[in-house]
A protein has these predicted regions:
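Membrane-embedded hairpin module used as a gating/binding unit in multi-pass transport
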Residues: 167-243
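Alpha-helical transmembrane segments
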Residues: 159-177, 287-295, 318-321
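Entry/N-cap segments of selected transmembrane alpha helices
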Residues: 33, 101-122, 273-299, 350-354
């Protein structure tokens, strides 16, 4: 009887995850716990980092059976086949007001300038030995746009998706810490004190026509990014039409929350010890930081140039909002500007380049897809 009991215990042990648990699995579970602490305890992008972190823990439990048909396989299908990022863009579009951009169209140039960091990191990654597709996927981290980073990584470097997504969302959450020193480095006290004129009112007609025309023009130029731009602008059309409130509300809330859970959890599920614990992950984190710093600096420098051209009417601080971390980057511009001049209110002005950055990052991704092409699956 004792022998039968021992055999039963041995069988239970052999079938358990403990039997195949490795040091790598333990390390990645600890990484997941640290990310949960940062998300819940410190408030770093909790809506995104929490499910990413929990997915990371789940991915590193041996014999989890996730490769079998079921809900987890559906989630992974949505990640690897670019289903979730466009749906996220639908929700983002429904929550985005392009009014500040339409009221001051030249801020579109600031959103474009902030994409310079993407291409700087791309070149740096290639110099470090990454393939051109991997380098492109790493570079897009500089746009501070998680869904676009995941979309491009799934197409060009699926093996790096977990590291790229974590880097992108981490730097998005660290915008208030990373950007202010760079903004102050490239501006003077006088620059930061500049008060900008109030934006003109934007008509309902302009707000309705913009997403339609933007979709047509960008999609014809870069067909590979039609899914992202099309869904972004469809969501915005829901918001601005005035007769689609139910669709707008669903896109902003129920759909956005559901897809966020699935996208973030699926991203965490890609963070297995085998794919994450290597020197490439460290390089990706470093290159992502370089890309983000480069994008912020390029936006501020272009803002300073714009200030010189228009006779001091543009506060260069709004250039840092050209990265597409909406609305965190615009808030940082407001905070830094108000510290220099308490009468300064830059938030709405900074929202122009901020929403332009969302478009700019998608365009940068489409440009790289058109020039380089996706990796063969």
């Amino acid at each position: 009887m004792f022998d039968a009991f021992v055999v039963a215990l041995t069988s239970v042990w052999a079938d358990s995850g403990f039997a195949e648990l490795t040091g790598g699995h333990v390390i990645m579970m600890l990484v997941g716990i640290v990310l949960l602490y940062l998300a819940i305890g410190k408030g770093f992008e909790p809506l995104l980092l929490s499910p990413i972190a929990f997915g990371c823990i789940l991915a590193n439990i041996p014999k989890n059976g996730f490769e079998e048909p079921g809900v987890m396989s559906v989630i992974m299908y949505g990640i690897h086949n670019e289903v979730f990022p466009p749906l996220i863009f639908l929700g983002v579009g429904a929550m985005t007001d392009f009014g500040p951009l339409l009221a001051n169209p030249k801020t579109l140039l600031l959103g474009a300038a902030a994409q310079a960091g993407v291409f700087v990191a791309l070149l740096g990654a290639m110099m470090m030995g990454f393939t051109v597709q991997e380098a492109a996927a790493i570079g897009i981290i500089g746009g501070a746009d998680g869904p676009t980073s995941i979309y491009l990584a799934a197409k060009m470097a699926p093996q790096l998706l977990g590291a790229i997504a974590v880097a992108a969302y981490s730097y998005m959450s660290l915008v208030p810490l990373i950007q202010p020193p760079i903004m102050k480095l490239f501006t003077t006290e006088a620059d930061r004190k500049i008060v900008m004129q109030q934006l003109r009112p934007v008509s309902h007609f302009e707000k309705v026509v913009f997403p339609i025309m933007c979709t047509i023009v960008i999609s014809l130029l870069l067909p590979s990014v039609t899914a992202l731009i099309g869904m972004l602008m469809l969501g915005n059309l829901f918001k601005e039409a005035g007769c689609l409130d139910r669709l707008s509300d669903t896109a902003q809330n129920a759909l956005m929350n559901t897809v966020t859970i699935m996208l973030a959890t699926g991203t965490g599920l890609t963070m297995s010890a085998e794919s994450f614990l290597n020197y490439q992950t460290i390089l990706i984190i470093i290159l992502g930081l370089i890309a983000f710093i480069g994008g912020t600096a390029a936006g501020v420098i272009f803002g300073k140039l714009m200030c010189m051209v228009d006779g001091g009417q543009t506060n260069p601080l709004i250039g840092s909002a050209g990265v597409s971390a909406v609305p965190m980057a615009a808030r940082v511009s407001q905070i830094v500007g108000q510290k220099a001049n308490p009468a300064n209110f830059l938030l709405m002005h900074a929202m122009g380049p901020n929403v332009a950055g969302v478009i700019g990052t998608a365009v940068a991704a489409g440009t790289m897809l058109a020039m380089i092409g996706p990796v063969a699956k």
